[in-house]
């Protein structure tokens, strides 16, 4: 049997108190009494892995579960659909245009339910089975809900999803097709309130957060995001990029990926740590950094094409990742998001949902402000596919023209509608 990290308990990110309770999903009780909402993280003893060569860490399993020895659940009982092992793609054309020759995309749209949420849900549902959960629940407008539904179906557990009436129909279909019971609520706050009652009254197992203000998701599930860092490091022959850009709302991915980098560094597998950058429509983390806040405050929200990350709330875990890495947040606009979505599709053949294209929006913005070194290695996490919300792309797509009867007419239409001069 290979050595593996040992679970100590759940640790508060702020006061560092450690709790042994395995089903503590409402954050740190001590900090909550002080009025500070803080998520917990799984405290791991990495000592059994010290001295290992990095290639010894990855097991014979495939995908995410190759790194079971640094996860808080037993790999031999993994609830898996083949998540992980997603490609790291060098964006040469976009990089050339932006003056960033080492620009990469970690394409998480190639996971089983087409988003990086599968990493969280695989680990969270595995833990749910370990602790004997009977019902799984989540509040989600799409990716997280679809993934939770799929992994619940994998083990035959009922799944109750609280979504919003405004969620795209495609997302609602994805959640229902896996057999989940989906109900639409008028506001995020109302769905969290109902979900919390299911957790506290009936012991439902949550894969997402359910508190107001939010603290983030299930701490065990967040551990799944660490494997993104492990996979990127392996692609770079056990090195780290200079910058990692993550679309962020409650910052589960941002924090989880950052935690992966800190573990790799603690184990001696990488020599340097990357800066983390959060791309966010309303900028609660950006605001907290600008004002020197210890805890993010709620900012003015509104509508955004990037529905999955359109939150006026930031979290302590997200701010922790940015501060610890010397990173930053970037406020982005719908116009910039759609421009980035189009650029990824037209120049690199990658159809990202608006919330995923937000990562490129942040890079384009920073590049235009001369805040990026052209020689730096930059990795953007493309969190999900544009097929989840195809309607969001319509503003930059022309109507499909009818084909003329004659070839000369066809060439004229191609020139007029698509700008293609193909007659020579």
Predicted regions and their residues:
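PLP-dependent amino-acid enzyme catalytic core
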Residues: 1-424
């Amino acid at each position: 049997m290979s050595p593996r990290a040992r679970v100590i308990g759940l640790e508060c990110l702020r006061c560092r108190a450690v709790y042994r309770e395995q089903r503590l999903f409402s954050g740190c009780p001590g900090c909550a009494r002080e009025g500070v909402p803080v998520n917990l993280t799984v405290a791991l003893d990495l000592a059994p892995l010290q001295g290992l060569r990095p290639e010894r860490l990855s097991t014979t399993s495939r995908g995410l579960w190759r790194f079971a020895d640094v996860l808080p659940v037993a790999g031999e009982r993994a609830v898996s659909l083949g998540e992980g092992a997603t490609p790291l793609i060098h964006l040469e054309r976009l990089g050339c245009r932006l003056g960033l020759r080492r620009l990469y995309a970690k394409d998480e749209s190639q996971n089983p339910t087409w988003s990086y949420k599968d990493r969280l849900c695989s680990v969270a549902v595995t833990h749910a089975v370990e602790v004997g959960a009977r019902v799984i629940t989540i509040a989600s407008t799409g990716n997280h809900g679809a993934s939770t539904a799929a992994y619940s179906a994998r083990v035959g557990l009922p799944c109750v999803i609280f979504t919003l009436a405004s969620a795209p129909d495609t997302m609602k279909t994805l959640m229902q097709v896996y057999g989940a019971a989906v109900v639409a609520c008028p506001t995020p706050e109302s769905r969290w309130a109902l979900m919390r009652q299911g957790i506290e009254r009936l012991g439902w197992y949550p894969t997402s957060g359910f508190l107001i203000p939010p603290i983030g998701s299930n701490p065990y599930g967040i551990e799944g995001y660490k494997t993104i860092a492990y996979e990127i490091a392996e692609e770079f022959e056990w090195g780290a990029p200079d910058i990692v850009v993550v679309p962020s709302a409650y910052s589960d991915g941002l924090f989880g990926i950052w935690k992966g980098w800190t573990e790799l560094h603690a184990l001696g597998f990488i020599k340097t740590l990357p800066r983390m950058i959060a791309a966010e429509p309303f900028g609660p983390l950006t605001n907290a950094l600008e004002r020197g806040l210890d805890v993010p405050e709620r900012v003015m929200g509104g509508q955004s094409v990037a529905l999955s990350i359109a939150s006026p709330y930031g979290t302590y875990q997200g701010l922790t990742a940015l501060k610890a890495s010397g990173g930053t947040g970037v406020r982005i606009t719908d116009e910039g998001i759609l421009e980035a979505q189009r650029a990824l599709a037209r120049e690199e053949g990658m159809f990202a949902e608006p919330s995923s294209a937000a990562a490129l929006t942040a890079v384009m913005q920073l590049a235009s402000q001369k805040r990026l070194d052209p020689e730096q290695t930059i990795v953007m996490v493309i969190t999900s596919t544009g097929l989840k919300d195809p309607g969001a792309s319509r503003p930059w797509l022309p109507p499909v023209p009818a084909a003329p009867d004659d070839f000369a007419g066809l060439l004229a239409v191609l020139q007029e509608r698509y700008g293609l001069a193909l007659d020579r």
